[in-house]
Protein backbone atom coordinates (compact mmCIF):
# COMPACT_ATOMS: atom_id res chain seq x y z
CA UNK A 1 0.00 0.00 0.00
CA UNK A 2 1.17 3.49 -0.85
CA UNK A 3 0.18 6.59 1.10
CA UNK A 4 -0.27 9.92 -0.68
CA UNK A 5 -0.70 13.31 0.91
CA UNK A 6 -2.47 15.52 -1.63
CA UNK A 7 -2.30 19.10 -0.41
CA UNK A 8 -3.17 22.52 -1.80
CA UNK A 9 -0.17 24.84 -1.79
CA UNK A 10 3.30 24.67 -3.29
CA UNK A 11 5.50 27.18 -1.49
CA UNK A 12 5.97 26.00 2.06
CA UNK A 13 8.40 27.45 4.62
CA UNK A 14 11.70 25.62 5.09
CA UNK A 15 10.65 24.25 8.48
CA UNK A 16 7.69 22.47 6.85
CA UNK A 17 9.93 20.88 4.21
CA UNK A 18 12.45 19.85 6.87
CA UNK A 19 9.83 18.36 9.21
CA UNK A 20 7.86 16.61 6.50
CA UNK A 21 10.97 15.20 4.82
CA UNK A 22 12.24 13.86 8.15
CA UNK A 23 9.18 11.62 8.51
CA UNK A 24 8.95 10.87 4.81
CA UNK A 25 12.42 9.29 4.83
CA UNK A 26 11.51 7.11 7.82
CA UNK A 27 8.67 5.30 6.07
CA UNK A 28 9.52 1.72 5.05
CA UNK A 29 9.87 0.72 1.41
CA UNK A 30 6.78 -1.49 1.66
CA UNK A 31 4.68 1.56 2.62
CA UNK A 32 5.94 4.49 0.58
CA UNK A 33 4.58 7.92 1.42
CA UNK A 34 4.55 10.74 -1.10
CA UNK A 35 3.46 14.35 -1.24
CA UNK A 36 1.52 15.72 -4.19
CA UNK A 37 1.18 19.48 -4.16
CA UNK A 38 -1.72 21.16 -5.94
CA UNK A 39 -1.15 24.80 -6.91
CA UNK A 40 -3.47 27.10 -4.97
CA UNK A 41 -5.80 29.21 -7.07
CA UNK A 42 -5.21 32.96 -7.02
CA UNK A 43 -7.27 34.50 -4.26
CA UNK A 44 -7.84 38.21 -4.52
CA UNK A 45 -10.45 40.72 -3.56
CA UNK A 46 -12.79 39.71 -6.41
CA UNK A 47 -11.84 36.04 -6.64
CA UNK A 48 -14.56 33.49 -7.37
CA UNK A 49 -13.86 31.23 -4.39
CA UNK A 50 -16.36 28.56 -5.45
CA UNK A 51 -14.67 28.25 -8.84
CA UNK A 52 -11.21 28.13 -7.21
CA UNK A 53 -12.34 25.43 -4.75
CA UNK A 54 -13.89 23.40 -7.56
CA UNK A 55 -10.71 23.58 -9.66
CA UNK A 56 -8.48 22.63 -6.72
CA UNK A 57 -10.88 19.78 -5.95
CA UNK A 58 -10.76 18.48 -9.52
CA UNK A 59 -6.96 18.44 -9.41
CA UNK A 60 -6.92 16.69 -6.03
CA UNK A 61 -9.35 14.00 -7.17
CA UNK A 62 -7.38 13.49 -10.39
CA UNK A 63 -4.21 12.99 -8.32
CA UNK A 64 -6.01 10.50 -6.06
CA UNK A 65 -7.33 8.45 -8.96
CA UNK A 66 -8.97 5.23 -7.71
CA UNK A 67 -7.31 5.38 -4.30
CA UNK A 68 -9.22 5.34 -1.02
CA UNK A 69 -9.86 9.01 -0.26
CA UNK A 70 -9.55 10.28 3.30
CA UNK A 71 -10.17 13.98 3.82
CA UNK A 72 -8.63 15.99 6.64
CA UNK A 73 -11.46 18.12 7.92
CA UNK A 74 -12.59 19.51 11.29
CA UNK A 75 -15.95 17.64 11.21
CA UNK A 76 -14.12 14.34 10.57
CA UNK A 77 -13.50 11.56 13.07
CA UNK A 78 -10.92 12.35 15.74
CA UNK A 79 -8.66 9.28 15.88
CA UNK A 80 -6.19 8.83 18.68
CA UNK A 81 -2.90 7.14 17.84
CA UNK A 82 -4.03 3.52 18.48
CA UNK A 83 -7.20 4.16 16.45
CA UNK A 84 -5.13 5.57 13.58
CA UNK A 85 -2.91 2.47 13.75
CA UNK A 86 -6.05 0.29 13.48
CA UNK A 87 -7.22 2.34 10.47
CA UNK A 88 -3.81 1.92 8.86
CA UNK A 89 -4.13 -1.86 9.28
CA UNK A 90 -7.64 -1.81 7.73
CA UNK A 91 -6.35 0.25 4.81
CA UNK A 92 -3.57 -2.29 4.23
CA UNK A 93 -6.11 -5.15 4.18
CA UNK A 94 -8.24 -3.23 1.69
CA UNK A 95 -5.41 -3.49 -0.85
CA UNK A 96 -5.80 -0.01 -2.31
CA UNK A 97 -3.50 2.96 -2.03
CA UNK A 98 -4.69 5.79 0.22
CA UNK A 99 -4.86 9.50 -0.63
CA UNK A 100 -5.21 11.93 2.26
CA UNK A 101 -6.54 15.31 1.10
CA UNK A 102 -5.71 18.66 2.70
CA UNK A 103 -7.58 21.62 1.26
CA UNK A 104 -6.54 25.22 0.88
CA UNK A 105 -7.53 28.30 2.94
CA UNK A 106 -11.25 27.70 2.40
CA UNK A 107 -11.01 23.96 2.93
CA UNK A 108 -12.00 21.19 0.55
CA UNK A 109 -14.37 21.32 -2.40
CA UNK A 110 -17.79 19.69 -2.08
CA UNK A 111 -16.64 17.11 -4.68
CA UNK A 112 -13.69 16.07 -2.48
CA UNK A 113 -15.92 15.74 0.56
CA UNK A 114 -18.43 13.68 -1.44
CA UNK A 115 -15.71 11.36 -2.81
CA UNK A 116 -14.23 10.70 0.63
CA UNK A 117 -14.68 7.26 2.15
CA UNK A 118 -13.48 8.64 5.47
CA UNK A 119 -12.84 12.00 7.05
CA UNK A 120 -10.20 12.48 9.74
CA UNK A 121 -10.09 15.42 12.16
CA UNK A 122 -6.69 16.18 13.64
CA UNK A 123 -8.22 18.67 16.06
CA UNK A 124 -11.27 20.80 16.70
CA UNK A 125 -8.87 23.72 16.25
CA UNK A 126 -8.29 25.31 12.87
CA UNK A 127 -4.67 24.45 12.09
CA UNK A 128 -2.35 26.15 9.59
CA UNK A 129 -2.17 23.93 6.53
CA UNK A 130 1.64 23.82 6.44
CA UNK A 131 1.67 22.49 10.01
CA UNK A 132 -0.92 19.84 9.11
CA UNK A 133 1.51 18.29 6.62
CA UNK A 134 4.06 17.68 9.36
CA UNK A 135 1.44 16.49 11.86
CA UNK A 136 -0.04 13.99 9.39
CA UNK A 137 3.38 12.61 8.43
CA UNK A 138 4.39 12.16 12.09
CA UNK A 139 1.01 10.68 13.05
CA UNK A 140 1.10 8.14 10.22
CA UNK A 141 4.69 7.21 11.01
CA UNK A 142 3.78 6.74 14.68
CA UNK A 143 0.75 4.62 13.70
CA UNK A 144 2.98 2.49 11.47
CA UNK A 145 5.43 2.06 14.35
CA UNK A 146 2.62 0.66 16.52
CA UNK A 147 1.58 -1.84 13.84
CA UNK A 148 5.15 -3.13 13.53
CA UNK A 149 6.18 -2.94 17.21
CA UNK A 150 8.85 -0.41 16.29
CA UNK A 151 10.23 1.34 19.39
CA UNK A 152 9.38 4.87 18.12
CA UNK A 153 6.01 4.81 19.92
CA UNK A 154 5.99 4.28 23.67
CA UNK A 155 2.90 3.76 25.80
From Swiss-Prot:
Domain of life the protein comes from: Bacteria
Protein residues bound to S-adenosyl-L-methionine: 72, 103, 122-127
Catalytic activity: pseudouridine(1915) in 23S rRNA + S-adenosyl-L-methionine = N(3)-methylpseudouridine(1915) in 23S rRNA + S-adenosyl-L-homocysteine + H(+)
Biological processes, Gene Ontology terms: rRNA base methylation; rRNA methylation
GO MF terms held by the record: protein homodimerization activity; ribosome binding; rRNA (pseudouridine-N3-)-methyltransferase activity
SUPFAM superfamilies: alpha/beta knot
Keywords for this protein: Cytoplasm, Methyltransferase, rRNA processing, S-adenosyl-L-methionine, Transferase
Enzyme class: transferase
Effect of substituting residue 138 to A/Q: Loss of activity
Primary location recorded for the protein, binned into one broad class: cytoplasm
CDD domains in the record: RlmH-like (cd18081)
Record GO cellular component, one term: cytoplasm
Record carries keyword Transferase: yes
Record keyword Cell membrane present: no
HAMAP family listed in its UniProt record: 23SrRNA_methyltr_H
Function as written in the Swiss-Prot or TrEMBL entry: Specifically methylates the pseudouridine at position 1915 (m3Psi1915) in 23S rRNA. Specific for fully assembled 70S ribosomes.
NCBIfam families linked: PRK00103.1-1 (NF000984), PRK00103.1-4 (NF000986), tRNA_RlmH_YbeA (TIGR00246)
Oligomer status and interactors: Homodimer.
Official protein name in the record: Ribosomal RNA large subunit methyltransferase H
Organism whose genome encodes this protein: Escherichia coli (strain K12)
Gene that encodes it: rlmH
Amino acid sequence: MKLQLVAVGTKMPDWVQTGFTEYLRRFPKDMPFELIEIPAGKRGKNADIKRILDKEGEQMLAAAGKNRIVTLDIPGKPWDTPQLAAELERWKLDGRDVSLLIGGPEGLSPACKAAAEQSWSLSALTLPHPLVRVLVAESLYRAWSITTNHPYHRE
